[in-house]
Amino acid sequence: DGPARPRIEMQERWCNYVCEELTPRALEINREQGPDHMGKVLVGGASMGAGHAVNLFLRRPDLYNGTIALSGLYQADMFFKGYMDDLVYRNSPCDYMRNFPDNHPYKELYAKADKFIMCCGQGQWEEELLRSTLQLRDILESKDIHPIVDIWGQDVSHDWYWWEKQWVYFLEMTLGKA
């Protein structure tokens, strides 16, 4: 809680830190390990982390090569109770992707991404997140951007028990079995 502008400014500082400092440093360290460790980063998260992961990927597909997002909320209005400004908009994928121009250069990067996965259950505590996942899917599809959207059963709740199963499933799908 608290005033909206300082909270969203902190969110934007975090996003800038991850994109401008943390990720470049991680890539630099990987390059030092040799050619087998080069490339882009796959971002992922569950719950609030899913929202962050999708936001990072959609804002910076030049840095991130995809996302695995489990049970995410992809619009910022829940956190800002009707407040909207440039920074809230910039951190609300459903809002900014609705206005995404057809000729934007990121569109090609989204198409080249290894994986763009959004998953949500239909069980307890997933209702609003399921609506958000389907809303973002529909917005993206209308822009000819095609995420993998996997909706799990009505027994799948917003809980670590399920996210652990989903991580194993999607990491094997993305990276292959160990």
What are these regions (language model features)?
Residues 1-178:
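Non-catalytic cap/lid and distal C-terminal segments of serine-dependent acyl enzymes
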